[in-house]
Design a protein with these regions (language model features):
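Catalytic center-proximal scaffold of phosphoryl-transfer enzymes
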Residues: 1-177
Length: 178
């Protein structure tokens, strides 16, 4: 959502007047804090410190955990916020971790539902991605899940992630071979 629109909506909903630039600055500050927290957690994990799992209800903890991962190439410009300069393509690795539940739709059919969704995204290669994915998997207490499903395509590196991190407890599903 553009910051100008967010500023207007905040004013409409709360009566507060906050400029778009103030909202942008707040987001930058919170983003820097979140990045510092993540780096501290990754450092602690690499030193062998235990990761505290997220508190889950008994209902969520009893559901299977799905971990799906993929990678994309994204175009970046060398000069921020302008269309100037030659595009440089960079690798982004992404994953979603979710408990696999069900719900009843309006037609009365039982359909799958992703619950307790968590995302991991890393600008960089697979080796930079693995620690962040391991951290979130530990937060989701993957080793205690009744079933873990790894879903990935045949892209390079992802099956190494599976073998290294999840083969001891997960069923692997190939969704599309490259």
């Amino acid at each position: 959502m553009p910051y100008e629109l967010a500023s207007w909506l905040l004013g409409q909903w709360s009566g507060l007047s906050v400029s778009a630039s103030t909202l942008w600055n707040w987001v930058q500050t919170k983003g820097e804090q979140a990045q510092a927290d993540l780096e501290a957690q990754l450092s602690a994990q690499s030193e062998g410190q235990p990761v505290t799992p997220e508190s889950l209800s008994a209902m969520l903890a009893a559901l299977p955990l799905a971990i799906a991962a993929d990678g994309v190439m994204v175009p970046f410009r060398p000069v921020a916020n302008t269309p100037k300069g030659k595009i440089k393509w960079q690798e982004i690795k992404i994953a979603i971790l979710a408990r696999l539940g069900t719900r009843v739709n309006r037609a009365g059919a039982v359909v799958p539902q992703l619950l307790n969704r968590r995302l991991v995204a890393v600008l960089g290669d697979i080796d930079r991605f693995i620690p962040s994915l391991q951290l979130e998997a530990r937060r989701q207490d993957f080793e205690s899940a009744p079933q873990v499903v790894w879903l990935s395509d045949g892209g390079r590196g992802f099956w190494r992630v599976y073998r290294t991190c999840f083969a001891h407890c997960a069923v692997a599903v190939l969704d599309f071979f490259h």
